[in-house]
């Protein structure tokens, strides 16, 4: 529908979370898109990002570079030991680094060593003129362990 938002995101498997609950356990948004915008957002959530330092640059970072509205796009994420690296159509769009904080168990900046599961979702954006159904076309999803 014309008033839908689409998302491709990762949430931790609660059985293996290093930190329990949200946002402490982390959330990785590879793609968030609203019909209201001509860009996508890539976002990282953790206790550190959402509670300790909410003025950071990792909440809903707009991505214009490489994004082709109305076409299939390829989104990527490398989950590495010390960083999360995001891609759109082969272009690196964002990197979030492990800060190796001395007080990590208090700050909970890097919960991204847990196992995560993939969520593909659509949802209404705003309450005006809601119409159904809502679609998100996905050609393929590939997961590779490095």
Task: Tell me the role of every PLM-derived stretch.
Residues 1-146:
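GH16 jelly-roll
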């Amino acid at each position: 529908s014309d008033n839908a938002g689409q998302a491709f995101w990762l949430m931790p498997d609660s059985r293996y979370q290093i930190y329990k609950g949200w946002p402490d356990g982390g959330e990785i948004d590879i793609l968030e898109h609203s019909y209201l915008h001509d860009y996508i957002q890539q976002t990282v959530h953790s206790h550190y990002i959402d509670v300790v330092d909410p003025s950071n640059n990792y909440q809903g970072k707009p991505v214009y570079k490489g994004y082709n509205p109305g076409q299939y796009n390829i989104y990527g994420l490398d989950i590495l030991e010390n960083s999360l690296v995001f891609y759109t159509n082969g272009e690196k769009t964002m990197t979030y680094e492990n800060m190796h904080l001395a007080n990590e168990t208090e700050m909970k900046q890097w919960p991204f060593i847990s196992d995560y599961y993939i969520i593909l979702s659509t949802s209404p954006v705003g309450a005006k003129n809601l119409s159904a159904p809502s679609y998100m076309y996905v050609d393929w999803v590939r997961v590779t362990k490095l």
